A protein has these predicted regions:
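C-terminal segment of N-terminal export signals and the immediately downstream linker at the start
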Residues: 1, 17-28, 32
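N-terminal secretory signal peptides and thylakoid transit peptides that target proteins
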Residues: 1-14
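Well-ordered beta-strand positions in beta-sheet-rich domains
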Residues: 33, 40, 73-75, 80
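Functional-site microenvironments in short loops/helix caps that host divalent-cation chemistry
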Residues: 35-36, 42, 46-65, 103, ...
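Acidic-aromatic/histidine active-site loop/patch
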Residues: 89
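Short, structured beta-strand segments at or near domain termini in extracellular proteins/domains
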Residues: 272-286
């Protein structure tokens, strides 16, 4: 299979207008997957939450009013689905690279400069670059980064074929429910930021192995849903940019690390702060 055909299949599978394609249900909670039961949850933010977020969110967030793009707080009902307990790691992504010949996570300095939002100098990117199809030494259990939306979709397509189940990227609502539970809490653990529960605020200055912050587990049992890296979703902003979730990254202030926070990025963006996890569909659940 050529890389072009593989990517076309991945995009068609994950971005189809109808997300109720049949697949034998076999997803269940285990070491790697968490089942999120059907039912309503509180999604988005209200003025009270955003005011708190701006107080703890840093000067750039306040100056640019980053949190004003968040969806209004409301009850949303979803069908049951399963989601990865952990972010996709370098080791897992390397198996995909080796079996498909897909491009490895990397970016040249020119490509990086053209993206236009240089949060970090290219020198900071170099430790994350893959070489000869292999992830950097010592980072096997770290989340894979420097992947675009298409790269993440291609991985989900490959995983679907390999495990004979339907994997895709989460929509924004699915990611948010898995991160905050049903009661509308700001963070996976509650409504107030707590030190030591997430890899954030540049305290480590790097990604960490997935699942390292056990105290920050979400109500459903997902890890790293605040801090470490932002995560791709299949949802879009009106301007066509992809909605990124993930509760911020290792480089972000606490206000950005809330479950309701959302950020728009070009779909071809590759950055050391961007990773992903997958959803496994259950009983051809229809997302409303």
């Amino acid at each position: 299979m050529t890389r072009r055909r593989f990517l076309e299949g991945a995009m068609a599978l994950a971005l189809s207008p109808s997300l109720d394609l049949a697949l034998a249900a076999g997803c269940r909670s285990d070491e790697h997957l968490v089942v999120i039961p059907a039912g309503p949850f509180w999604m988005g933010s209200d003025a009270k939450e955003r005011d708190y977020a701006y107080r703890i969110g840093g000067e750039a967030a306040r100056r640019n009013r980053w949190f004003d793009v968040e969806l209004p707080r409301r009850r949303v009902r979803l069908s049951a689905y399963a989601i990865d307990r952990y972010l996709v790691t370098n080791v897992e992504y390397q198996r995909f690279i080796q079996e498909t010949g897909h491009r490895a996570p990397s970016i040249t300095e020119d490509e990086y400069q053209r993206q236009g939002y240089l949060v970090h100098a290219y020198q900071k990117v170099k430790p994350y670059l893959w070489r000869d199809g292999r992830h950097p030494d010592g980072r096997g259990k770290h989340p894979v980064v420097l992947v675009s939306l298409a790269d993440a979709l291609a991985y989900a397509h490959w995983r679907s074929d390999k495990e004979k189940q339907r994997y895709r990227l989460p929509i924004e609502a699915e990611w948010e429910k898995a991160a905050r539970g049903t009661d509308g809490r700001y963070f996976p653990w509650g409504n107030r930021w707590r030190l030591g529960l997430a890899n954030a605020e540049y305290r480590v200055g790097d990604t960490t192995e997935v699942g390292s912050y056990r105290g920050g587990v979400s109500p459903f049992g997902c890890l790293d849903m605040a801090g470490n890296v932002f995560e791709w979703t299949s949802s879009e902003f009106p301007d066509g940019k992809a909605v990124m979730k993930g509760g911020g990254s290792w480089d972000d202030q606490p206000g950005i690390c809330r479950a309701a926070a959302r950020h728009g990025r070009a779909k071809d963006a590759r950055h050391i702060l961007f990773g992903f996890r997958c959803v496994c569909e259950m009983d051809a659940a229809t997302i409303r």
